[in-house]
Amino acid sequence: MTYRSGLTPILLLLVSCIPCIAGKPNIVFFFIDDLGWTDVGFMGSKYYETPHVDKLASEGTIFHSAYANAPNCAPSRACLMSGQYTPRHGIYTVGDPRRGNHTLRKLEPTENKTVLADGFTTIAESLGSNGYTCATMGKWHLGKDPPTQGFHVNIAGREWGSPSGGGYH
């Protein structure tokens, strides 16, 4: 299967936590933006072939009643990382909510933060304090660098979201 960064708006944030202490389970968590609930084989897709994801699903835990806390990537990710709803962390959208032609705007945009404040304890910080080494791979959009939020390994995540240079290559 070949992926091109412009082909689909899917965002992949993979958090892989490897235990440092024997007896703790490995945790591999996929947080994917714009993935429809039937866009993978194990959920019934007849169009997309996802054999590796299907295998992981058959051996792991699937959250069937989960929902996104926000309509797009950065606020959803901030909710997941902090355990807080959008009004608490203040990240409502990606970037400046006042973008676009202001004469066409029907509502005044809410003040928006673009960085998850250091005062929030992230899931990576909580796992790290319990003996896990945490990694993030993919889009970040929550501040300058994921290691400032508890991640020990960061591949491709920066404040602008995706890696510089235009893709995940």
Residue ranges and their predicted role:
Residues 1-10:
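Bacterial N-terminal signal peptides that target proteins for export
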Residues 9-17:
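Bacterial N-terminal signal peptides
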Residues 2, 19-20:
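C-terminal multi-pass transmembrane helix bundles with aromatic-rich, positive-inside signatures
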